[in-house]
């Protein structure tokens, strides 16, 4: 069973997602604090703090703290602190603090604080 910070199972995790596919604080499909599809603090499709499609703190399509399409702190295509394609603090495809595909603080595919197969504490530092 995979759970997020609050203990929800993977696939639908986060603080209050609507559909159960994405996760986050209150998104509709994706994850994040209030996005519509993607994840992040308030994006429309992608993830991040306020982007339109991508992810990051304020980008339009890409992700990161302010980019237009690219990414934030160090990724290759996506954005975030170190991802390869997606966005987030260290993911490989998705976004979040350490996920592999989805978004959130530690998930592998989904999103939220710890979905995929790890708990919040485990995923915060490294996801399984």
Swiss-Prot record:
<dbReference type="GO" id="GO:0007165">
    <property type="term" value="P:signal transduction"/>
</dbReference>
<dbReference type="GO" id="GO:0048589">
    <property type="term" value="P:developmental growth"/>
</dbReference>
<dbReference type="GO" id="GO:0005882">
    <property type="term" value="C:intermediate filament"/>
</dbReference>
<dbReference type="GO" id="GO:0022405">
    <property type="term" value="P:hair cycle process"/>
</dbReference>
<dbReference type="GO" id="GO:0043480">
    <property type="term" value="P:pigment accumulation in tissues"/>
</dbReference>
<dbReference type="GO" id="GO:0043588">
    <property type="term" value="P:skin development"/>
</dbReference>
<dbReference type="GO" id="GO:0051726">
    <property type="term" value="P:regulation of cell cycle"/>
</dbReference>
<comment type="function">
    <text>In the hair cortex, hair keratin intermediate filaments are embedded in an interfilamentous matrix, consisting of hair keratin-associated proteins (KRTAP), which are essential for the formation of a rigid and resistant hair shaft through their extensive disulfide bond cross-linking with abundant cysteine residues of hair keratins. The matrix proteins include the high-sulfur and high-glycine-tyrosine keratins.</text>
</comment>
<protein>
    <recommendedName>
        <fullName>Keratin-associated protein 21-1</fullName>
    </recommendedName>
</protein>
<comment type="similarity">
    <text>Belongs to the KRTAP type 21 family.</text>
</comment>
<keyword id="KW-0416">Keratin</keyword>
<comment type="subunit">
    <text>Interacts with hair keratins.</text>
</comment>
<keyword id="KW-0677">Repeat</keyword>
<dbReference type="GO" id="GO:0031077">
    <property type="term" value="P:post-embryonic camera-type eye development"/>
</dbReference>
<feature type="region of interest" description="51 X 2 AA repeats of G-[YCGS]">
    <location>
        <begin position="11"/>
        <end position="117"/>
    </location>
</feature>
<dbReference type="GO" id="GO:0001942">
    <property type="term" value="P:hair follicle development"/>
</dbReference>
<dbReference type="GO" id="GO:0008283">
    <property type="term" value="P:cell population proliferation"/>
</dbReference>
């Amino acid at each position: 069973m995979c759970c997020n910070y609050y203990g929800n199972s993977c696939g639908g995790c986060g603080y209050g997602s609507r559909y159960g596919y994405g996760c986050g604080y209150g998104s509709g499909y994706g994850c994040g604090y209030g996005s519509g599809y993607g994840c992040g603090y308030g994006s429309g499709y992608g993830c991040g703090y306020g982007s339109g499609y991508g992810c990051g703190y304020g980008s339009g399509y890409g992700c990161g703290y302010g980019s237009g399409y690219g990414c934030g702190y160090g990724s290759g295509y996506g954005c975030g602190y170190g991802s390869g394609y997606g966005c987030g603090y260290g993911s490989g495809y998705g976004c979040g603090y350490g996920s592999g595909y989805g978004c959130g603080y530690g998930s592998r595919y989904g999103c939220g604080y710890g979905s995929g197969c790890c708990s919040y504490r485990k995923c915060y530092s490294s996801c399984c």
